Amino acid sequence: MVNVHEKQSTETITKIRNEVGLDATLGYQHCDMTDLIQVQEVFSALRDELPRLDLCIFGSGIDQAHFTTDLHCIDAYFGMMWLGHFYASNLLWPLLRRTSKIPNAPAPRVVFEASGQQSLQSSFDGSSSDEEILRRSAYNAEVCSEIFCRSKTSLILGVRHGLADRIVKRHHDNIYALAVQPSRSLADAGGQSRRDSRWQFSDLCDHVLDTLAKDPYFAVRSSSRIVLYAATSLDVEKKYLNGAYLVDIVSLSFRLCFCTYC
């Protein structure tokens, strides 16, 4: 487990050991995914130390609900969800390739979690007027929405066109790369409401996300827990879901569409 929060990680490891047995082999490594120097050091060491890597799930930043910048003075969404995750995956790729060549071993999987739209909760002091609170809330929500859309679009398209198309297929790797969005409602998987009648740059990102989420040839919609589905389902190999964007939608009926490529 690689995490910037030590307490959270140790508590999780303790809980897992209590459930599956104290002899469970678990470990924790500190790393700030927005610090690319740390990412290089930590994941290069893991690449050299681990004998194999069958599954890697990247989920940093999915619960971030406010705008902030990282050590490189770029928004932390982009730093974690795009730069940090993809840099780490590139560092681990030689290990994934070695694992894929082990006789009778299943194809390794790399899963990138893309967050649903964050709900922004702003706190204001008692001296702020109602009008000021509304104005600042609208501004903060706008900033949060734009950085979310930009980073999420980068992650989804990066998995499909960056990893699946340009690396896996080009080098004939027996490795699967998937992007998933754990959602709580249909609204999370659908489009964002337009803020006004004027065209804005963020509308382009909104439109791309809308299209990806609704395209039956690109998105897999499942009522199951989508991360677990991406990590364990036999459909990933049977339907060759490499580069797919999997969306967890709460619905009464189970619907499964699989992506195909020319």
Regions found by a protein language model. Name each.
Residues 37-41, 253-259:
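Short, solvent-exposed polar/charged micro-motifs at secondary-structure junctions
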